[in-house]
Regions:
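Active-site groove signature of glycoside hydrolases
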Residues: 158-185
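Substrate-binding cleft of secreted/luminal carbohydrate-active enzymes
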Residues: 270-347
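Aromatic-lined substrate-binding rim segments of carbohydrate-active enzymes
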Residues: 70-73, 85-133, 188-202
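Aromatic-lined carbohydrate-recognition surfaces of secreted/lumenal glycan-active proteins
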Residues: 128-138, 196-221, 269-276
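C-terminal segment of N-terminal export signals and the immediately downstream linker at the start
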Residues: 23-35
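Boundary/entry segment of secreted carbohydrate-active catalytic domains
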Residues: 32-76
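Aromatic- and acid-rich polysaccharide-binding/catalytic face
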Residues: 170, 176, 221-250
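N-terminal secretory signal peptides and thylakoid transit peptides that target proteins
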Residues: 1-17
Length: 348
């Protein structure tokens, strides 16, 4: 689908993309025509880790009841999403479940993990459960810190015992993200494999995912393929880094094409995309996250679709809300992205 056809298509759906213009660079970088993959999942959280970014939904989520968490899961299922990735089971040295590791978060819902997994059982959502943050989430040293590692592994065991009976407990996510520059660090591979070793013992049927950043810097050469072979993960969901302004939608197709070839050579982990459906209200990392216009999100989907098995988004929460929802979490503009995406998805 060329740029002109895409614009005509979106205008026909009434999504207000008059701002889209023909871009010769975009035309040159566009992947081969083909089906645009939908967004089949999203990251999920009880509190956003960067407080300034989550100012529009963190206060609402603190007050969510069990019923509201169920409503939110139902909403997500209604837009065709199948997977949710729970970013954190602990944050800022407080836990979202009952544990001796940390004191619990003071939330209106006594057991939010149970609430969302029970709802996910009902609505057919598959959850990846986050094995973090059991140290300082902003520190690069957390993955090598023996104290944090001990807490992290204790949490994996406790989470299995408490919630492993849920049909929606589909997999694990290791949230201390890697910076690919231009390869994974040995420390990150050791961290991943240590977590995965225990997870395989406790929950052998689950899938394991990571979502590294530095996608634009990745060098998918022989050494990179060997690293993919060495890591015990089932899925690598690469961040497209469009929302954080490190990459442009005209560039990302080439990044994912190279990574696809590396994954095909390795034949071990699946390649998924983690597209950022937000934009910053002001300075990157130091202002509120706002929903991106669907015209841009569509371009992100189009760019990665030929090269990945699935597309996940960062993230539904805060960036998308069903109009009139009793579980509203985010700014008013989030209903526009929800409606525009749902209109597109329903037309497929």
């Amino acid at each position: 689908m060329n740029d002109l056809n895409r614009r005509d298509f979106l205008v026909a759906l009434g999504m207000g993309v008059s701002a889209l213009t023909l871009d010769p660079v975009a035309a040159q970088a566009s992947p081969a025509p083909g089906r645009i993959k939908p967004i089949t999942g999203s990251w999920f959280e009880f509190q956003h880790h960067a407080t300034v970014e989550g100012v529009d939904w963190n206060p609402s989520c603190v007050r969510f009841s069990t019923r509201q968490w169920e409503t939110k899961i139902k909403e997500i299922a209604e837009v065709g999403m199948e997977y949710l990735v729970l970013m954190a089971t602990a944050l800022y040295y407080r836990a979202f479940y009952k544990t001796s590791i940390f004191a619990r978060w003071d939330l209106a819902c006594a057991d939010p993990i149970e609430a969302v997994l029970s709802a996910a059982d009902r609505y057919g959502i598959k959850f990846f459960i986050g094995g973090g943050f059991y140290g300082d989430w902003e520190s690069d040293n957390t993955i090598t810190d023996p104290v944090a590692a001990k807490k992290r592994l204790q949490a994996v065991e406790e989470l299995t015992n408490l919630y492993g009976h849920h049909a929606s407990f589909f997999g694990w996510y290791w949230p201390d993200e890697a910076f690919i520059n231009p390869h994974f660090s040995p420390e990150f591979i050791e961290y991943v494999n240590g977590c995965s070793r225990l997870a395989r013992q406790l929950t052998p049927k689950t899938q394991i995912m990571i979502a590294p950043y530095g996608t634009r810097k990745a060098l998918p050469d022989d050494a990179y393929v060997r690293q993919l072979d060495a890591m015990d993960v089932d899925i690598v969901a690469y961040q497209d880094e469009v929302g954080v302004r490190k990459s442009k939608v005209t560039e990302t197709a080439a990044f994912y094409e190279g990574l696809r070839k590396a994954h095909d050579r390795s034949q071990k982990a699946k390649i998924w995309a983690d597209i950022e459906i937000f934009e910053f209200q002001g300075q990157v990392y130091n202002s509120a996250l706002m929903p991106a216009p669907f015209s841009r999100v569509f371009q992100q989907m189009e760019a990665v679709s030929p090269w990945v098995d699935r597309i996940l988004a960062y993230q539904y929460q805060g960036m998308m809300n069903k109009p009139g929802s009793e579980a509203f979490a985010g700014c008013p503009a989030s209903t526009r992205l929800y409606t525009d995406y749902l209109n597109w998805h329903s037309a497929q």
